[in-house]
């Protein structure tokens, strides 16, 4: 494992314990091993990540495409009511094939473990998840909902239709065994944040959080500052 201070080691151990209890990982003895990386979050806490760069370098790329964001947003043009859903730890809801689990082994200060569910950081994780969610919602996608990875938006031209559309999507997800992060779900809204934009009936705006940094940036005064602006 990479060198880490007491705070980082504690954060690492806490996350390992959490994943063990959730059935996401298990102890492992493997010829594969990737190091843990703890990435600082804006709030000062640490995000647990595994550095899979070596594994990704020898992984054959899955070319399954992600949806075009502009096409997703354009499809919402006539809608007047929206609901957004967030899959609970989305990638973890995809089980790993037994033959591939050892490849995900990571070494930490708490020992070596392998994933039983698909972890973040794998080269093909986005394509794998997108394919799975597209198959699950194939009968509803582009008709009542749009899906970009674990972000789902349900859209309708009337509140009456929206009741039915929300029920169809939630029932389909439940039948597929997928769970949602309720605190990040929003229902029956006239304006929602989706893919970095605020979606309203007949209006589209860039989300404030995506323009704040540009608005607060100081104007460059030298050639060097201009190049990095």
Question: Across the structure, where does each feature detected by a protein language model lie?
Answer:
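Retroelement reverse transcriptase polymerase core
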Residues: 1-229
